[in-house]
Amino acid sequence: MSDQMPFPFNNFTYFFTLFSKFFSSFHHCTCSLSVSRQYLALDGIYHPLRAAFPNNSTRRKHFTNNWDPRHTGFSPSMTSCSKEHRQGPATKLPSSNYNSDVEDARFQI
């Protein structure tokens, strides 16, 4: 054995405590979760687990019938809807040869 101990017993209280509030077998930068029946243990506080969707979510009509194609999920100031999703008449793009459509308009000096 070497003369130096790998763990200094005089500083033992700084490295280990029996209080569950302060002791964790994991590194402090990780988060340890444990699931016990209907509760989730996080930081010593038990939070009841809830389903992400209610049991009758397939019977609700607003998931499909009231869908607004103009809704992007973003704030109006952040983005606008794409042309495919806009309602109303489509805008006509100018032709590549914009002078060919005007035959009667002749300019005279």
Swiss-Prot record:
GO biological process: regulation of cellular respiration
Domain of life per record: Eukaryota
InterPro entries: TAR1 (IPR044792)
One annotated Gene Ontology cellular component of this protein: mitochondrion
Localization in the cell: Mitochondrion
Annotated segments matching region Disordered: 62-109
Keywords per UniProt: Mitochondrion
Function: May be involved in mtDNA stability or mitochondrial gene expression regulation at the post-transcriptional level.
Protein name per its UniProtKB record: Protein TAR1
Species this protein is from: Kluyveromyces lactis (strain ATCC 8585 / CBS 2359 / DSM 70799 / NBRC 1267 / NRRL Y-1140 / WM37) (Yeast)
Protein encoded by which gene: TAR1-A
